[in-house]
Amino acid sequence: MSNCILSRPCSYAIRAMVHLAEQPPGRFSSSREICDQEDIPPSFLGKVFLPLCRNRMLRSLRGIGGGYELAVPPDQIRLLSIVQAIDGSQLDDCVLEDHACGNPRQCLLHPGWAAVREQFLNYLESTTVADLVRMRKSAHLTIPAGGDTPEVIPSTK
């Protein structure tokens, strides 16, 4: 496991989904627009959008005027769904090893990690993309790559 709970692609996916949620209904956003406005490397966008399309969270349209839009309202997309689509079972990984904890006695940190993991899963399950849009509007938060703590950027609006 990396030094972050969520992978960099997962962080990019969440940022892109928030961007799409901020668009008017029916408006498709191009890959270039999303990458430019959310500071996402273009090489990552297709990789993170494919599983989101497969999981019916995103819709894509090819051609002129095409791009991506949310397939369901943002208040129906839980962060846990995005994380599971992108990172799979990574949250089951031990904080000390690159694999899932199999025996709680093997890892002295297991009981503490299990409690933290449960709280984090509850947060991901109870938080929607719409919630992040509201948070970003109220504090103008940016969601950094690599899953670091969100940064507060003073709003210029």
What are these regions (language model features)?
Residues M1-L6:
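Short, Lys/Arg-enriched N-terminal segment that forms or immediately precedes the first helix
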Residues R8, P73-D98, W113-E118:
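Conserved segment of winged-helix/HTH DNA-binding domains
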Residues R8, Y12-I40:
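N-terminal helix-turn-helix DNA-binding core of bacterial DNA-binding proteins
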Residues P41, A71:
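Helix-turn-helix DNA-binding motif, specifically the short coil turn and the N-cap/start of the second
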Residues F44:
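Residues in the helix-turn-helix
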Residues V48-C53:
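Basic amphipathic alpha-helical segments that dock to polyanions
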Residues M57-L70:
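Beta-hairpin "wing" of winged helix-turn-helix
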Residues D98-K157:
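C-terminal regulatory/oligomerization modules of transcriptional regulators
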